[in-house]
Amino acid sequence: MRVVRADARGACERRLASALGFVLLACGCATESPPQPPPTTPHAFEYGSALPRASWPTQDWYRGFGSDELDEFVGLAVRDNTDLTVARERVAEADARARQAGAAILPKVSIDGNATYLSGHSNQGSGHELDWFAMLSASYEVDFWGKNRATANAARLGAGASRAERDTVALTLLGGVAGEYFQVLALRERLSIAHANRDATKKILEAVQARFDAGVASPTELASQKAAWYAAQIVISDLEQLEMEARATLALLLGRPPENFEVRAENLDSLREPLVAAGLPSELLTRRPDVVMAETSLRAAHANLAAARAAMFPNLTLTAAAGVQNPALPAIVNTIPGVGPSYSAIAGLTQPIFDHGRLAAQRDEALAKEQELLATYRAAIIASLVDVEKALSTVQHLDAVREFQQGNVAESERAFEGAQLRYQRGSGDFLTLLESQRTLYAARDQFAQYRLARLEALVTLCKALGGGWNASAAATRDAEIAPAARAHDAASS
C-alpha cells in the first residue's frame, strides 16, 4: 500500500475545504410577494348584537353541553374515526414532501468508494494485491433566482394547508358527533312522548268501548279511536327505526361497528345550552380552519408560481470532489510520479433554449392555479361569514319562539284534560276529545323537535365560529380528550 505524504494530504484537504466552503457560501434565496389581500369583512355580524355578550367558543366547546357521555364519544371519534385518520396521514405525507423539497436548498454531500482484491499464481510463485479508492464530493445548485427556495416554501405551505384540512375534518367530525348524539336523545324523547300518547289513546279506546257496549257511543267513534291507536303504534315503530339509524350513524362516526353499540342517556333533559356569541368578523379569518386552509393553499400556489418563473432562468451548479486511491497495478502507477490524493472543482451553467414552450406552459399553469385558489379563498371567506350569519339568525329565531313553544304545550295539556273530563261525564263530544289528544301529542312532539333544533343550532354556530380553532388547538385537543376515550374503553370492557 502506498503511503501519502502528510504535506500533500494537508494541501489536498485545504483545497477541498476551500471548495466546499465556496459551495456553502453560495446559497441564494428569493422571497415572494404575498398574494392579494382578502375581501373586506363587515365591522359586525348582523344578528350578533341580539345575543348576550359572550366570547368565542373554546376548542372544547362540546363540553358546554354538560354531557360526560358526549365527551367520551368525542374522544373516541378523534382517536378512531377513519376520515380523521386519513387526514392525519395526509399531513404526514405533506411533511415528508416538505422535507424533500427543503433538501434541495442545501448542498449535497456524498462519498464513493470501492475495494478490489486480486490473487494469482505463476511459475515464479503466487501473489495478491488490494486496490481501493475513496472520494468525497459535494454539489450545490446556486439558487440565484429563488427556484429551490420557492419550491421548498410551497411544500412547507402545502403541509400547513394539510394541517388546516385535517383540523377542518376534525371540526366537522366533532359537530357530527354532537349532532347525531342529540338526534339519538331527541328520538328517544319523542319515543317516550309517542308511548305516552299510545297509552292515552288506549285508555280513551277502553272508555269508548265501554260506552259503545252500553249503547252510548256510536260505531264511528269506536272505529275512529281504534284507528288512532293503530296510528300511534305506527309512529312508535317509525321512531324506533329512526333511532336505530341515528345510533348506527353515531357508531360510524366513532369508528365503531353498530352491533352492540349503546347510548346511555334517554332524553335531552340532562343537557345544558352553552352561551355562544360571535366576536368581530375580521377575527373569523384566523379562527376557521377551512379559511386558513384556503389562504395557505393560495400562498403555496404563489410560491409555485415563483418557482415556475425561476425555472426559465439559467441554473448554476457547483461541484467539488477529493479522493484517495491505492493502485492495484504498481507497474503502471510507478510510471506516474506523485500518485495520491486528487481533487476537483467544477462550475456548470445550464440555460434552456428551446423546449417547445414547456417552461412557459408550466408558468401559465401555475399562474392560473394561483388565480383559481385566490377565488377559492375569497369564496371561503364569504361562505364563512354567511355560515355565521345564518347560525346566529337561527339561534335568535329559536330563542324568540321558545315561549310560544312552551305555551303551546301547556295550553294543549289543559285543553286535553278538560275535553277528557267532559267526555267522561258525558257532557263533551268525542270529536273534541280526539282532536285535543292529537293536538297535545303534536305539541309535545314539536317541542321535542324544537329542543333538538336549538341544540343543533348551537352546534352549527360553534362550527361556524371555528370551534375554538387556532394554529395549536388540534394538538392540545387531542391530548385532552384521549383520557375520555380510554375511560369509555375501560367501562365497555
Task: Label each PLM-derived region with a short phrase.
Residues 415-455:
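C-terminal structured "cap/appendage" subdomains that terminate the fold
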Residues 2-4, 12, 16-79, 132, ...:
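Terminal intrinsically disordered/low-complexity segments used for targeting and assembly
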Residues 212-216, 423-427, 464-468:
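A short glycine-centered flexible hinge/capping loop motif at secondary-structure junctions
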